[in-house]
Amino acid sequence: MGASPLILGVKYLHVSGKNISVGDFATFITSPDAHVHITTWNADKHDGKIEAGKFCLFSPGVRISAATSIKIGDSCMFANGAYISDSDWHGIYDRALPVGKSLEVVLEDNVWIGDSAVSYTHLRAHETNSN
């Protein structure tokens, strides 16, 4: 965790796994019915990584789950209930095998992920230009 994070509802923020970094001045807003989960899968052949830049906003109910790699640029915002993952988490035909297809996710600077948005594997969202 970088310098000066703002965490509203600290007991509802769940960070689990290895290789997780969040830049300076991140804001996490949580609530009893909408926890924020930042999770990596580090087992078998997978060594998940999550890297978030500076000034990111994580709203209630946000989930970010990585089996490979999720890179989040500076000043990105995640609205209520957004879910970003780099994996399908299991195959269609053999659901007993963990993880399944997993490809890197990259969110460039100033990307906003809207309310209840869900995205899996190989997303690349380009920087939002305010001009």
Regions found by a protein language model. Name each.
Residues 1-85, 105-110, 116-119:
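Domain-scale signature associated with acetyltransferase and cell-envelope carbohydrate enzymes
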Residues 93-98:
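Flexible, solvent-exposed loop segments that connect beta-strands
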Residues 121-128:
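Conserved small/polar residues in nucleotide/adenosyl-binding loops
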Residues 131:
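Gly/Pro- and small hydrophobic-enriched strand-loop and loop-to-helix capping segments
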